[in-house]
Design a protein with these regions (language model features):
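Non-catalytic alpha-helical scaffolds and adjoining flexible linkers that form interface surfaces
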Residues: 1-141
Length: 141
């Protein structure tokens, strides 16, 4: 809820989709100090909440995670050290997620296999690059 307006009703989400949003919450708690003002992260969360009203909440939560990481200085699209870690299609999808403009249509389709590959990569990225073990790891799989 924001300024008396319900952004989207998380209680209507499936268990799997809600777990993805818990992932976003856990990510924010891991990356951003409590009580410290962080306008970019706030803007990402607000835009994601608005977008989740009308679009796939699981995909929106994943896009928000990518954007939050980049805003915190951990851009998963730039830090692909091992080019074999992701297929070309998954790398392209990850870059399209990173560049997505809230409120605009998403360019192209999202294959389940490529999305799953990106989700596995994100969990590894958080563990290896950010030194963060997520309790909700695997939420997007």
């Amino acid at each position: 809820q924001y300024e008396g307006r319900l952004l989207f009703d998380m209680m209507k989400l499936s268990y799997e989709d809600m777990t993805c949003w818990y992932y976003v919450i856990e990510l924010v708690l891991a990356l951003y100090p409590v009580g410290q003002k962080e306008d970019e992260a706030y803007d990402i969360l607000m835009a994601a909440a608005r977008a989740a009203e009308e679009r796939n909440p699981r995909v929106i939560a994943f896009i928000a995670s990518i954007k939050l990481l980049a805003a915190a200085g951990y851009d998963p699209t730039e830090a692909i050290e091992d080019p074999t870690a992701l297929s070309e299609g998954a790398r392209d999808l990850l870059c399209r997620f990173r560049g997505y403009r809230w409120g605009s249509p998403f360019e192209g389709s999202i294959s389940r296999a490529l999305f799953t590959e990106c989700a596995r990569y994100l969990d590894q990225f958080l563990s290896n690059v950010c030194d963060t073990e997520m309790k909700t790891a695997g939420a997007f799989l």
